[in-house]
Regions:
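His/Asp/Glu-enriched, well-ordered alpha-helical/loop segment
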Residues: 90-108, 112, 124-136, 141-227
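His/Asp/Glu-rich metal-coordinating catalytic cores
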Residues: 9
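Short, function-defining helix-loop hinge/capping sites that tune catalysis or transport
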Residues: 87, 145, 151, 232, ...
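Active-site core of metal-dependent hydrolases
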Residues: 14-145, 244
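Short secondary-structure boundary/hinge segments and terminal tails
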Residues: 64-66, 87-88, 116-117, 203-204, ...
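Metal-cofactor-binding active-site regions of metalloenzymes
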Residues: 1-5
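C-terminal cap of metal-dependent C-N hydrolases
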Residues: 206, 216-265, 271-275
Length: 275
């Protein structure tokens, strides 16, 4: 379940999913769920019928349950290696199932904290750069100062390095942005810019069925552009050709509703591992 509270988790329900899609009014393009849950088969097959991408997420599925989910229509592994049953030599688990099946693409958090650098390399080597989607897993705490905050429905600590944790030591999402992971792919894992762009831009657009308008710089596509310097600092961001961010704007992008409950110094003794 990751960092989510148990009461926030929902069992797969066709009736509820139909309601979600009605409210979404055509804007729902991706749904994540655990395939081992009762009712998952019906909902997954319904979403596939509706041409909506389904990913296996926050799952304790064994290899057999994972294979069933893929056969029903799961085509993406949600933040691969995190909140998934891991690999054991007698039980490959969800992670093993998603890595082995060629029908499945894999999301990857590349902050090198959620996933060890060598594990990230292994996942990419198994799946290839054409089947990896770089994600941030960023939450509303991204960019805020160290301290204890109330988000995800509970208290969590953001430490001096920007990592977010629950009191029991569980990683609570990420506070790093996409460009941080992109830089790590190039600078720390030694992938080419071209391969990093595939993982960060092209593959996500393909899976989201918007590659005809996004994901690459081409004539007649949306001019969604990020301009960076040699140190991977974001200089400018354009959305459909319109300048939406500039390093010169000097905006405060932090969410003003997120106010620290305690400072880092006051809170850190209550958190396992001292963060």
């Amino acid at each position: 379940k990751g960092a989510f509270k148990v009461e926030y988790l929902l069992k797969p329900s066709l009736e509820l999913m139909e309601e979600f899609l009605k409210i979404g009014n055509g804007h729902v393009i991706h749904v994540s769920m655990a395939p081992e849950l009762e009712g998952a088969e019906e909902v997954i097959k319904y979403l596939v019928y509706k041409n909506i991408l389904v990913s296996g997420a926050h799952t304790n599925a064994n290899i057999a349950q994972t294979k069933k989910g893929i056969d029903w229509g799961i085509r993406l592994s949600n933040h691969t290696g995190n909140a998934q049953r891991s690999i054991h030599h007698r039980e490959p688990g969800a992670l093993g199932g998603y890595l082995l099946d060629e029908r499945v693409d894999c999301e990857l958090i590349c902050d090198l904290y959620h996933i060890h650098p060598d594990m990230a390399k292994l996942i990419i080597k198994i799946k290839s750069v054409d089947r990896i989607c770089l994600i941030s897993d960023s939450i509303e705490a991204t960019g805020i100062k160290p301290g204890e905050y109330n988000f995800l429905g509970r208290m969590a600590l953001v430490d001096e390095d920007g990592w977010s944790k629950l009191p029991d030591g569980t990683i609570a999402g990420s506070t790093k942005d996409m460009i941080y992971g992109f830089r790590n792919l190039v600078k720390e894992l030694n992938f080419s810019m071209e391969d990093a762009i595939k993982m960060a831009c092209v593959n996500p657009a393909r899976l989201s069925n918007v590659l005809d308008s996004k994901g690459t710089i081409e004539v007649n596509k949306d001019a969604d552009l990020v301009v960076i310097d040699d140190e991977f600092n974001v200089m400018y961001t354009f959305v459909e050709g319109k300048l939406e961010y500039s390093k010169d704007f000097n905006y405060d992008y932090c969410n003003p509703k997120i106010i620290p409950v305690r400072t880092m110094k006051e809170a850190r003794g209550d958190y396992i591992g001292q963060c």
